[in-house]
Amino acid sequence: METIIRKIDKNQINQDVIEEAGNVLKQGGLVAFPTETVYGLGADALKEEAAKKTYAAKGRPSDNPLIVHIADYEDLKKVAVNIPPETDALAAHFWPGPLTMIFEKSESVPYGTTGGLDTVAVRMPSDPIAAALIRAAGGFVSAPSANTSGRPSPTTAEHVRVDLEGKIDMILDGGAVDIGLESTILDMTVEPPMILRPGAITADMFEEVIGPVGVDETLVNSESKQAPKAPGMKYRHYAPKAKMMIVEGNIREEILAIRQLAYAAHREGKEVGIIATGETVQFYNYCLLYTSPS
């Protein structure tokens, strides 16, 4: 399969490119596109066969549900039923944005999209390219992260190309994403609503809008036998290709050990990345992949 790559500017959207990508989705194809969180692998959320193609392209188990993306709030009622009253307040504060909410699914959503569950995960992305594509495709686009299952989520179109070229129909290259972290998932089928996957929107932020929320046991107890209920949490996730080491100890010991390991790898001609906090970043002189704000 030839993968078509189209450049697109979110500040000046080319409607011809959007219509081309929308037609690919309407015909059952797969299109990778940018959202504010990560690049998503889009398919028609209301077609069972499109869901099967998504699972095949990603090498993703078919019982791992997909998130349905919408561009207009009124469309939520077409894919979800028994929507709780708190939803309006949450949507007013956090949609469009990096929040996925789980509801009871409507009959229009196939079980292929929901991973065989009677619930559906729904999000309204804020990226204008994503919103335009969703509308052009008919309003409902399922979109897990656009990567091979288990790999780190892509934040650029090049990440998608390297991983999925030849497996999907099209990539919309809208540049680097804004957040780089997948959406927070909130289960609205329980009382109080429960966080199933952490993300940019925190429990404190939810509490300011609707009061206290719960946190899924699997997030706070690594020995929990409870089955994860959210997309991306049931199977191995965020697994980089490179070897990764975790160094533990007091700060002085950690810094010394990490510098020694990095120096030894550098001497062997290897590229080195160090994940560090703002407190210790100044002590490292090698390539830094990510710096935590705390």
Kindly give the residue locations of the regions a language model identified.
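Active-site-adjacent structural elements in enzyme catalytic cores
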Residues: 1-292
